[in-house]
Amino acid sequence: MNKVGSFLIGALLITAGCSEAPKPIDLVFSPSEDVTLGNQLHDEILANPEEYPLLSEAEHGDAIAYLQGMCDELVASGKLDYSDQFDYKVHIIDADVLNAFAAPGGKMYFYTGLINFLEEEDDLMGVMGHEIAHADRRHSVKQMIQNSGVQWLLSAAL
């Protein structure tokens, strides 16, 4: 092997250990695509105020800011894989429903029914941590990829 080839192989081996290997899901669906998908979902939610009556920041800014502060505290823990790539933003849906959900890319939606039901801030932090984990672990995207694979297999079988 010539000197240039040896140098290139050595440089490749040295630099290969310098960066973290991408997660397998990142090779199929990038984190920026999560953000785009989450933004598209948010646009759909905004377009359907009868089903998803979001509280406005103009009228309920204090409540939204309070929850966003809790979110920011959890995101700053340093334990998330995508904290620098996802925009963890809290939204409140004005409906008497005991639920919350996270969109790909970090947007989260909490129903007023759940917020009013929970008695302690720690309970809400627990739910919020759960939703943040869904986004950070990319559960929605993994499910979409899995479902598309199943659909592909079904279409190939038929």
Residue ranges of each PLM-predicted region?
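A Zn2+-metalloprotease active-site environment signal
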Residues: K3-G10, A16-L158
